[in-house]
């Protein structure tokens, strides 16, 4: 308000006067700098750069530069106690003239992204200063939201560019609750994993505009003198506003040279009542209603199966404990007693849809003495000698890693042991395995007692119907809007969200049918994989294709001509093939690959049946199924069914 009054009283010189308009603009900028613009940054160099930039914009020839030492200052914006940080900054003391008027009218910022692991020493203070949004796993920018709102006057506006993680992550629950209940969200624009804003950073930018809520009591006293004419309007707006302006711009479509127009074109409104402490969904109303319908169907996964998402083994030093088949055979050849301790394991990249694709890798599963009664468990200084005598080849293999193994945080009672684990026995049971980070919808059934590394999670259950539901298009469509997004728009099925996923109740007849379909799809996947291995072995031995291309590793997706062309390309131009060799390729295709392609066609029809069964279990109408496919995310597990 003061700025508007100042501007109204300034009469610019006539345009024809030399430098008149420029002088007026510079004078106006100086007024703004002195009375209206404030800034705080932790880095002194950033403070100097900001001051310099503002001086350049406001300098007037032959006049002293505006003194910015009070307005643009160094300090820790979120810590006010100098005992915690000597750079602590007390906003109300340092900018007392602003708070004499109730606080700032606007706060604009791009808070730093500092992971919570680096905040350990100041977390107790953060909890004191920001109790309404504090979470021990929250990254630093969460507290900047609360600080920005604290220093605003009621009705003031906050605009931040931050990561979008707070909208879905567990640590953002308190912040979501605070923003939804205490303040007025005006606009949110989500850019996904856009790289255009900060090319050198791996970020998920979003833009949020929030109006500070008008409070009773103290809030009213602060603004009644200067904003009384506005008070009724602000309160009415809070009570009556039902819509928030939302924009979602896919990362590949972001154009910085056209951003305002893009935001305007992509904008739509959502009901304010949709947003609370649960993960936020910024979807159009019809999509939101479909999401809600899915989320009301059935019971939580944990309740249905009793299976909690469980992580694979964290070794602390993979190069010591994870070995290939050649190494495994060498160790067992030297000491056959160690064979039961070397077990097959699955990595994240081995998890394929329906069945895992074991890569011939092994884990030395030396459990902690706290979990297993090893003969050396309680021998103290003699423990290593006992281990060396009991399993000489394992000791010989691990000894070169001793120094690194001793430095592990994740270790057992002795340096050669894995960390304590209470669920070793679960690995021997049938289980559904899935990746920690999912680029594709891939849940696999493992009944081979495979171990898993820490990039794999599992659900200890033999309920194949659940496998079918998790692999369905409906659940991928839902999870795209439910699970946190990672780099390259991969999803992370964090445990507390996955165990809360609503699993629909199928009628008994449909449940049997769904289970039968899943069993057939497991067989199809196994047969396809066997075919691929047979073909690759044949190509290696008969046609010297030692490094098959990615396309050859999915030979059942190729036509006969494509198969021949890909073999020729893999062999290289300098190695031509005779007519007899080319005929041999086509004969092998007809003999081995063609039947597998037919089997895959049958599998696709089974997938379509499963698609319909799961949709029916969720109670979806034909129009809702069409909407699901019309708004399908990338990488749906199957092609759109012809009947949709």
Segment roles from a protein language model:
Residues 2-6, 10, 41, 45, ...:
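Generic, well-ordered alpha-helical scaffold segments in large soluble proteins
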Residues 3-32, 58-71, 126:
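Flexible phosphate/Mg2+-sensing switch loops adjacent to catalytic phosphate-binding sites
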Residues 4, 42-84, 91-336, 443-456, ...:
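Signature of N6-adenine DNA methyltransferases within the class I
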Residues 11-15, 63-68, 411-416, 485-487, ...:
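Short, glycine/acidic-rich hinge or "gate" loops at secondary-structure transitions
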Residues 15-25, 32, 417-419, 483-488, ...:
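Active-site-adjacent structural elements in folded domains
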Residues 36-37:
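Short beta-strand element of Class I
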Residues 142, 149, 260-261, 267-519, ...:
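Polybasic, glycine- and aromatic-enriched phosphate-binding surface used to engage nucleic acids
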Residues 276-281, 297-303, 393, 505-644:
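Non-catalytic DNA-recognition/assembly elements of restriction-modification systems
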């Amino acid at each position: 308000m003061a700025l508007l009054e100042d501007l109204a009283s300034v009469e610019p010189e006539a345009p024809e006067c030399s430098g008149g308009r420029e002088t007026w603009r510079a004078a106006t900028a100086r007024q703004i700098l002195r009375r209206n613009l404030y800034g705080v940054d932790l880095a002194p160099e950033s403070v100097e750069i900001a001051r310099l930039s503002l001086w350049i914009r406001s300098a007037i020839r032959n006049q002293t530069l505006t003194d910015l030492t009070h307005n643009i200052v160094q300090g820790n914006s979120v810590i006010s106690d100098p005992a915690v940080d000597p750079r602590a900054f007390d906003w109300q003391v340092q900018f007392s003239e602003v708070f004499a008027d109730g606080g700032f009218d606007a706060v604009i910022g791009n808070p730093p992204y500092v992971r919570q692991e680096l905040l350990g020493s100041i977390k107790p203070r953060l909890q004191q200063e920001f109790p309404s949004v504090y979470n021990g796993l929250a990254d630093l920018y969460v507290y900047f939201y609360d600080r920005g709102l604290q220093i605003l006057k009621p009705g003031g506006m906050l605009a931040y560019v931050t990561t979008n993680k707070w909208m879905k992550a567990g640590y953002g629950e308190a912040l979501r609750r605070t923003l939804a209940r205490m303040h007025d969200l005006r606009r949110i624009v989500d850019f996904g994993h856009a790289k255009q804003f900060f090319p050198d950073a791996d970020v998920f930018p979003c833009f949020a505009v929030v109006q500070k809520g008008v409070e009773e009591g103290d809030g009213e006293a602060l603004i009644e003198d200067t904003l009384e004419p506005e008070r009724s309007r602000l309160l009415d707006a809070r009570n009556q506003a039902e819509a928030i302006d939302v924009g979602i711009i896919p990362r590949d479509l972001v154009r910085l040279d056209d951003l305002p127009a893009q935001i305007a074109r992509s904008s739509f409104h959502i009901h304010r009542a949709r947003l609370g402490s649960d993960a936020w969904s910024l979807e159009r109303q019809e999509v939101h209603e479909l999401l809600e319908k899915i989320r009301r169907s059935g019971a939580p996964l944990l309740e249905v199966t009793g299976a909690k998402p469980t992580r694979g083994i964290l070794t602390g030093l993979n190069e010591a404990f994870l070995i290939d088949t050649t190494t495994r055979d060498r160790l067992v050849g030297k000491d056959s007693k160690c064979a039961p301790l070397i077990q097959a394991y699955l990595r994240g990249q081995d998890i394929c849809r329906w069945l895992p694709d074991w890569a011939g890798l092994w884990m030395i599963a030396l459990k902690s003495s706290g979990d297993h009664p090893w003969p050396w468990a309680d021998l103290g200084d003699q423990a290593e000698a006992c281990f060396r005598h009991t399993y000489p080849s394992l000791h010989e293999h691990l000894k070169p890693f001793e120094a690194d193994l001793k430095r592990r945080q994740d270790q057992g009672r002795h340096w050669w042991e894995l960390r304590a684990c209470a669920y070793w026995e679960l690995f021997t049971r049938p289980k559904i395995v899935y990746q920690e980070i999912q680029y594709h919808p891939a849940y696999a059934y493992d009944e081979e007692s495979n171990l898993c590394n820490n990039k794999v999670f599992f659900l200890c259950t033999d309920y194949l119907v659940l496998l079918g539901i998790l692999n369905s298009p409906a659940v991928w469509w839902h999870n795209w809007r439910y699970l946190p997004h990672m780099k390259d728009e991969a999803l992370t099925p964090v445990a507390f969200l996955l165990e809360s996923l609503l699993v629909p109740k199928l009628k008994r007849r449909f449940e049997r049918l769904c289970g039968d379909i899943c069993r057939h799809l497991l067989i199809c996947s196994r047969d396809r994989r066997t075919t691929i291995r047979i073909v690759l072995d044949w190509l290696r031995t008969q046609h010297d294709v030692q490094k098959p291309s990615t396309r050859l590793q999915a030979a059942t997706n190729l036509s006969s001509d494509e198969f021949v062309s890909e073999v020729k390309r893999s062999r290289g131009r300098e190695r031509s093939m005779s007519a007899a060799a080319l005929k041999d390729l086509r004969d092998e295709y007809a003999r081995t690959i063609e039947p597998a392609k037919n089997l895959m066609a049958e599998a696709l029809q089974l997938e379509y049946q499963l698609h319909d069964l799961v949709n029916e279990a969720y109670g979806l109408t034909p129009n809702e199924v069409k909407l699901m496919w019309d708004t399908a995310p990338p990488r749906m597990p199957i092609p759109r069914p012809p009947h949709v």
